Amino acid sequence: MNNSIGKVLDEFNKTLDEFMNKMILQFPFENKLKTYYSAFKVTKMCDKTIPIKIYMGGCLQFSDQIKNRDTEFFAKRKTFVNRMSVASSFTDDTGLVNYWDNLSVNSKNAIWDYVQTLFVMGEMFINKDSGMIQKINNVYNNISFNESMKTLNENNTFTEEFINKINK
């Protein structure tokens, strides 16, 4: 992996970690955020490219909404929700879709800043490998984030001690 990609990955992971921590403080009862954050920490330990691939897998099909700050990205409209259910989305995976309508303008702008910053870093990562988009789509379309976490929970893949350690 070349040095510039390594820097993008490090910055992406640092920014996503910061964003997730802020969102968990803002929405302490949203279990989806905590689950996403736990999965982020585990996957980052295994391979630091996985978090950016998961994020981009949940955002690629919504690039226009992200770039234009289109609130449909956070909407719960039936057509949007049906579209998300095929491959999932970052806002659904984290539960942010449930809070969007009740947030202040300042909070919405701060969230957009993070979402767009992470997306730009994701594009920088993808643009270095022409086959990366296809790889991300193949993985993301085969199993959604929620299905992955459900499988892990149902099969007791992680010990309670391990879960407690990564949730610290």
Predicted regions and their residues:
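Alpha-helical oligomerization segments
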Residues: 146-168
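Terminal low-complexity "docking" segments
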Residues: 1-136, 140-149, 153
